[in-house]
Swiss-Prot record:
Keywords: Heme, Iron, Lipid metabolism, Lyase, Membrane, Metal-binding, Monooxygenase, Oxidoreductase, Steroidogenesis. Heme binds at C445. Gene3D superfamilies: Cytochrome P450. It comes from Ictalurus punctatus. This is Steroid 17-alpha-hydroxylase/17,20 lyase.
Amino acid sequence: MGWLICFCVFAAIIIVALYLRKIHGFLVDDRAPPNLPSLPIIGSLLSINSNSPPHIFFQQLQKKYGDIYSLDMGSNRVIIVNNHHHAKEVLLRKGKIFAGRPRTVTTDILTRDGKDIAFGDYSATWKFHRKIVHGALCMFGEGTASIEKIICREASSMCEILTNLQSSAADLAPELTRAVTNVVCTLCFSSSYKRGDPEFEAMLKYSQGIVDTVAKDSLVDIFPWLQLFPNEDLRILRRCVSIRDKLLQKKYEEHKADFSDNIQRDLFDALLRAKNSSENNNTSTQDVGLTDDHLLMTVGDIFGAGVETTTTVLKWSILYLIHHPQVQRKIQEELDAKIGRDRHPQVNDRGNLPYLEATIREVLRIRPVSPLLIPHVALSDANIGEYTVQKGTRVIVNLWSLHHDEKEWKNPELFNPERFLNEEGNSLCCPSLSYLPFGAGVRVCLGEALAKLELFLFLSWILQRFTLEVPGGQPLPELQGKFRVVLQPQKYKVIARLRTGWEKSLQSQESESG
């Protein structure tokens, strides 16, 4: 009988151990995605120690493990999705199931414990919050005269600066950042800044500090207990966030002090109006926990993400244009034929400038500003394709793999705007479903319409007047890029030459305005 008792005890231990492993997501299941080698505590960290940027490394692993596989970041199971079929299942068909967000130390600092849209977890509060933000953005969104006027003002200022800089090699990044920042600041709280403005310089400084620290992928987000020890990056992050929050609080208090339901100047006013309206209609914001913090973090989201991403796409666009002067000439020929020199490009011209639109789409494809989408979290047990996914599992869509899939894109490493045009070259088309530059579904980027509008107007204004070139005697800048918060191009300089005939055109415009 002794052996029977031992057998029963052993079997009981095995059953309990297997159960515990299952509920923590570590059970080896034939239906689970292939998993990278994993060790207790550290997970798969030793297996993902690579010199390649993560989006490239994950694409390389696709050859060994398939389109969908998993790895363990410490105790957290993470699934990597590398094709558009599974990506759209996660983002669209099962969007609400995978709408969660992971809590990390750095994002909690950035967002006051997830009180924003981008990193906030999926909940009744988040849905109500997103609804009022979406409504507010629609009032200033694509096609509205107010936002077009704001962008054109900054595009005009940018062109004036380029005119003064012509024939001189310059890094355009600071001026692009200022122009896009002014668009976002005007949209959010009716402020714009000139070069050297102290408040503007403070914004740039804290924004850069946030980007530099978040970009380091600190181990504290994998092992939160590490925050108990001195951490210089977290100290810098908290200081920069504190400076940001003081500025946002100042703007918010100013808006609350002179708020009027009859006047809507900007996004802050729109958010205040929506919040007040919901309270007056007995749609209690307390029921969903919506606070002033949520509105502040929303504006922080729009400012942080809106400036960094759009500026980066503009830098990539200019870089590819100087690499491909024939593309630049085709855009200019299109601008000359459809707009001429007697007026500036407008929103209504978008439909008449398919080659420019195709070029923007190709830039977003070949160098997606967020090659890895923000991680999603499964809110319940589910499936992705044939694989089982347990509740709490994190899912990352590798947008880089989608946009460089050789099964979907012919010569994906080749910059070719024509792939987004029909055979006649006069109309836009979608050559592949493997294209999601702004994400999709429940978590789609709220600023998509604004970003597209900025890209179109800034590039059309610049290329109507200027030809962008590499400084004489210098090699073409590299196209590799640096993976940080977004995929940034390396620093480079460019010469903006005023196009032939524009000197007289500008003089004529100045005399008419005078």
